[in-house]
């Protein structure tokens, strides 16, 4: 991204004539949760190469995050028509079902993707999230660990493990998982938001406030993070007031 945004216009012009470059930029923007900009680059890539299959799993995730139901369904149909056995097609189809809250159908698609591409970390991770939606946390953990075996730097699987642990009440393990995910992807404010919330649930108000502030500094428009920070500050002030009042109440 630094090279493509750098001071040499000729480099930028040549690079952006290649569909694969747009896909790589789209992937990077996806990891930074800049989904609207990511969508633009993936659309340009497909306009250049309509039969492009590589990276389309990430494009389908971008469309999922943006709730582009029609575009996501069209992408899945195109990929299935090109190669009904490809993992990319099954992942796009799974994201289509998941967006419609058909989690069992989505899970089956993602599991099929793991069968045709056992090395695809994302397929295991997405299957893990669907297992979690289906109230199968043990299966979700196994799938997230499979994703980690495929790719040790697959931060999405760590975030999934954090979600499982948090639901189970293991705040310390959840915070460790989110912290590891952020060490891999240091440009994702959502991971900081999740880490802050986990620390808050663990009773570490100071740590949570510090992490929330880092997330806000990274993404100033993060309204939910600002709300969480404000609510925690208010609760902290109230707790301090109660502590000051308690000696008087005892007398």
Please report, for each region that a protein language model flagged, where it lies by residue.
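Alpha-solenoid helical-repeat scaffolds
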Residues: 1-108, 112
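Helix-start (N-cap) detector for alpha-helical repeat units in TPR-like alpha-solenoids
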Residues: 19-20, 52-54, 87-88, 121-122, ...
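Eukaryotic tandem repeat interaction scaffolds
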Residues: 148-237
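Eukaryotic, compositionally biased intrinsically disordered regions
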Residues: 76, 82, 86-87, 96-98, ...
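Structural signature of tandem alpha-helical TPR/SEL1-like repeats
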Residues: 2, 32-41, 66-78, 99-112, ...
């Amino acid at each position: 991204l630094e090279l493509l945004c750098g001071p040499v216009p000729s480099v930028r012009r040549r690079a952006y004539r290649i569909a694969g470059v747009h896909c790589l930029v789209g992937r990077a923007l996806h990891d930074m949760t800049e989904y609207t900009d990511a969508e633009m680059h993936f659309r340009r890539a497909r306009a250049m190469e309509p039969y492009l299959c590589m990276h389309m799993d990430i494009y389908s995730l971008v469309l999922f995050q943006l709730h582009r139901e029609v575009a996501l369904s069209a992408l899945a149909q195109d990929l299935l028509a090109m190669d009904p056995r490809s993992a990319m097609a099954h992942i796009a189809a799974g994201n289509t079902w998941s967006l419609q809250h058909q989690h069992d159908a989505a899970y089956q698609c993602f599991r099929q993707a793991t069968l045709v591409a056992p090395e695809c970390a994302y397929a295991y991770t997405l299957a893990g999230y669907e297992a979690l939606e289906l109230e199968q946390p043990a299966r979700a953990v196994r799938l997230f660990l499979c994703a980690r075996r495929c790719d040790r730097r697959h931060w999405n699987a760590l975030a999934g493990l954090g979600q499982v642990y948090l639901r189970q009440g293991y705040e310390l393990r959840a915070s460790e998982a989110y912290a590891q995910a952020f060490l891999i992807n240091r440009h994702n404010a959502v991971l900081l938001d999740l880490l802050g919330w986990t620390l808050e649930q663990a009773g570490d108000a100071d740590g949570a406030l510090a992490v929330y502030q880092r997330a806000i500094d990274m993404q100033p428009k993060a309204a939910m993070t600002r709300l969480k920070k404000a609510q925690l500050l208010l609760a902290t002030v109230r707790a301090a007031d109660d502590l000051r009042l308690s000696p008087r109440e005892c007398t």
